[in-house]
Structures are given as structure tokens and as C-alpha cells.
């Protein structure tokens, strides 16, 4: 049986907020929100919201990979939504993850939704899985008619985060990483630190709304999987497949925008920064190598090198690398060669991941992993989980992780301040610290 597809005649933003409000009634849900950023020529939708599950897979590294592949084959003609933990790396390489983990997400969670609402150029479209009963389908459609106009709530949300490591510990680690670079073990490494709150009860939907209002981003995500929540303002695409074309768009290089004539100078300074360009090009080379490892990959090329994209609060240096692959290649084949993304590891990739485990104190989990969809034709689109709040409602634990690329030219004090600056943008948003 085919899924039932119909159009919905409501304002897109009103519907999006309504769906967020009712999403808590489902055990699983996923919002992928581009916030109407027009610069992304590869984006097909303004937003997609998936609710409920017909089938799902909770997967950890110790499980057989065939379990994942069988799930994908069983649901080959279905839409699927997923999160991927950074620690899925341990399935593809001889690596480990033994640092503290208070979030306890699965290494991979994948579900086939009951309902999908897509906001595209033709308006709103509702797709109901063929396995949903007529009664449940009618009830869901009725909930959509109960849409309410947006009310701009000014609820006060106060969050006060603790630092997982001290400034002295951070700087000591940077010095050791620079030593590893000096002796040729690596060229560059992404080093991160965690900020956290224990014994806290939050409303993840309201947190996401405030995060997205303050920092609208092209790969924004809200994901609920039972007691686990992802609230992300990600600006970065990990990988996208459209037909036989794969696209990867790593970010390396960020500058805070100014609301004055000085903004153009800041943009040009980023564009011409030797340090930022060097970091970006190193990751481009790593991504090119990853894409070339994919079975049937050919004609790997850099379509954009160190281009500057401007967002409401920051300018970002983004490169675009593409390749041609066999159209029938699945996401599992692509993951084996490219995950985790090079922008969140360093180069050489495996050695950088070994040193990340050595110097960082928290298990990354979903941070620097990915959220995305696989459609009914096998095309997919995945983001990079950065600028993200992660929450375990059962453990009452909220986490934020920030970091940056470390090279031999890095100044430990400056790197610490940059990492703190990224965190403080969230702290100030929620009136804490």
C-alpha cells in the first residue's frame, strides 16, 4: 500500500509551532528546520516534521552491523529519520569511548514515522504512513485543525551551567596537543569541553523555540527519542545525497558579525585569514579523501573553497566538496567511509580521534554526531551536531559542548576564550552564568 499524501492549507510557521506543541504526545519526533535560508541551493524543504513511529531501531556499537543494514532493507521504500552518535566511529575503526557519559543516548536511533509534514515550495504536505489505521489518521488530521495562532511568549528560562574542566586543565591539554602536532602525530585536532547542569527539569520544546528564535540556522533540529532530547542550532551540513551526487560542506572559520559598517571589514578579514583558510583547506583534503574511499565514488571535486556565508550573528567559511556515486548505494556504505565528519575530528582522522579520547574528559555522544533523514528514494541529508543542547529527562541532565580546531599556530589562551565565547552565547540566551 502507498502512503497517503495530502496538502494542508495553513500558515507554515503557525503549523510548525503547533506541531512542536503537540509533538510531546509522541514517544519519538524529529524536526529538521532550514529557517528559510536561501543560500542553500541543495535544500528541498523549508522544514520537515516527523511524528510517531511505525518501526524503529535502537542501536549500539556492540550490536551487529547487519541489524542496521537489515532495518534499512526492510524499510527501503520508507522515509526514515535518525540520529548518529559520534561514538559510532568505534564501529568503523579500532577505537574506544570510555569517558564520562551522563546523557546515555544510543549510538544510533532510526525510526519510520507515522506522520510527516513537509514545508516545500508547493506549500504544506501531509504524508501518512500506509500502516497507520484510518481512525488514528483521522484523529491526527483533527489535531491539525486545532492550530492556534502564534503567541510570542516571553517566559523566563534561567540555566546555570558548570564547567567540566578548569581553564588550567584546558590550557594544559592545548599545550599537549600542540606538542603532538610538533612531533608530526597530527596536523590539526578538534578539541572540545563540556558545560552541564545536573538535577534540572526543563521544557525541551520551549528551550528549542528560544534557541531557534535567537539563533536561526539552516540545519536546526529538534529530536525527541523517549527521554532523550536534541535541541540544535546547527549551521553545518555533514553530507547529502541527491540522485548519484554526494555533497559535503564542512565549516572551518567563524567571525562574529557587527551591526555597523564594520561588518564588511570583519567578513573580508575572515575571507583572507591565513590561519582560518589553512584549517579549512586541511579539512577539505580530509573530506576529499573520505569521499574517494566510498565504493563506486568517482570525480571528487571541490566546487567551493573557503567561501564566506553570512548568517544573522556570524560569518562562516564553508567549502563544498562533491562526488558521483552509484545511485543505489545506501547510507550505511557512506557512513563507513565518511563518519564522523572531518570538521569535528582533525587530520589524520584516526590519530586525531585517538587523541580526542585521550585529552577530552566527556564522552561526546550526540555532540559532533548527526541528525538527518533518508527519503523513500534513498536520498538523504544530514547535519553536524554543534551549537546544541542535549538533555536526558530521566537523569535530569543537560549538556552543552563547545570547542574548536587546534593547530600548531594556536594560542592556548585564545582558544580557551573562543570556546568560552561560543558557550556564553547560549548562557546569555538563558540568563545563566
In which residue ranges do the predicted regions lie?
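Extended alpha-helical targeting/anchoring segments
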Residues: 1-433
Amino acid at each position: 500500500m502507498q502512503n497517503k499524501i495530502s496538502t494542508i492549507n495553513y500558515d507554515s510557521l503557525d503549523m510548525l509551532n503547533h506541531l512542536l506543541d503537540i509533538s510531546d504526545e509522541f514517544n519519538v519526533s524529529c524536526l529538521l528546520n532550514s529557517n528559510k535560508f536561501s543560500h542553500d541551493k541543495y535544500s528541498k524543504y523549508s522544514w520537515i516534521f516527523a511524528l510517531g513511529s511505525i518501526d524503529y531501531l535502537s542501536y549500539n556499537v556492540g550490536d551487529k552491523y547487519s541489524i542496521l543494514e537489515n532495518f534499512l532493507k526492510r524499510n527501503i521504500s520508507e522515509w526514515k529519520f535518525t540520529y548518529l552518535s559520534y561514538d559510532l566511529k568505534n564501529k568503523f575503526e579500532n577505537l574506544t569511548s570510555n569517558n564520562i557519559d551522563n546523557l546515555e543516548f544510543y549510538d544510533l536511533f532510526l525510526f519510520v514515522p507515522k506522520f510527516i509534514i513537509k514545508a516545500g515550495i508547493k506549500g504544506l504536505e501531509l504524508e501518512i504512513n500506509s500502516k497507520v489505521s484510518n481512525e488514528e489518521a483521522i484523529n491526527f488530521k483533527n489535531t491539525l485543525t486545532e492550530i492556534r495562532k502564534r503567541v510570542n511568549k516571553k517566559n523566563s528560562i534561567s540555566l546555570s551551567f558548570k564547567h567540566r574542566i578548569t581553564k588550567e586543565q584546558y590550557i594544559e591539554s592545548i599545550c599537549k596537543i600542540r606538542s603532538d602536532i610538533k612531533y608530526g602525530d597530527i596536523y590539526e585536532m578538534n578539541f572540545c569541553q563540556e558545560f552541564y547542569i545536573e538535577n534540572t527539569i526543563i521544557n525541551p520544546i520551549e528551550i528549542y523555540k528560544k534557541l531557534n528564535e535567537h539563533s536561526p540556522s539552516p540545519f536546526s533540529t529538534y529530536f525527541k527519542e523517549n527521554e532523550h532530547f536534541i535541541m540544535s542550532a546547527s549551521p553545518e551540513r555533514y553530507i547529502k545525497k541527491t540522485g548519484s551526487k554526494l555533497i559535503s560542506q564542512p565549516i572551518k572559520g567563524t567571525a562574529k558579525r557587527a551591526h555597523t559598517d564594520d561588518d564588511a571589514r570583519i567578513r573580508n578579514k575572515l575571507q583572507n585569514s591565513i590561519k582560518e583558510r589553512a584549517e579549512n583547506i586541511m579539512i577539505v583534503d580530509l573530506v576529499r579523501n573520505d569521499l574517494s574511499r566510498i565504493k563506486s565514488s568517482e570525480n571528487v571535486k571541490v566546487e567551493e573553497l573557503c567561501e564566506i556565508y553570512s548568517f544573522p550573528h556570524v560569518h562562516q567559511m564553508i567549502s563544498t566538496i562533491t562526488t558521483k556515486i552509484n545511485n543505489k548505494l545506501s547510507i550505511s556504505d557512506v557512513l563507513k567511509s565518511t563518519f564522523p565528519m572531518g570538521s569535528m575530528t582533525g587530520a589524520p582522522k584516526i590519530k586525531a580521534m585517538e587523541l580526542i579520547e585521550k585529552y577530552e574528559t566527556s564522552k561526546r555522544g550526540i555532540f559532533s554526531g548527526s541528525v538527518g533523514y533518508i527519503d523513500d528514494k534513498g536520498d538523504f541529508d544530514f547535519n553536524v551536531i554543534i551549537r546544541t543542547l542535549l538533555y536526558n529527562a530521566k537523569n535530569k541532565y543537560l549538556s552543552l559542548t563547545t570547542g574548536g580546531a587546534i593547530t600548531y599556530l594556536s594560542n592556548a589562551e585564545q582558544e580557551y576564550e573562543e570556546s568560552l565565547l561560543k558557550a556564553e552565547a547560549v548562557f546569555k540566551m538563558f540568563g545563566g552564568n
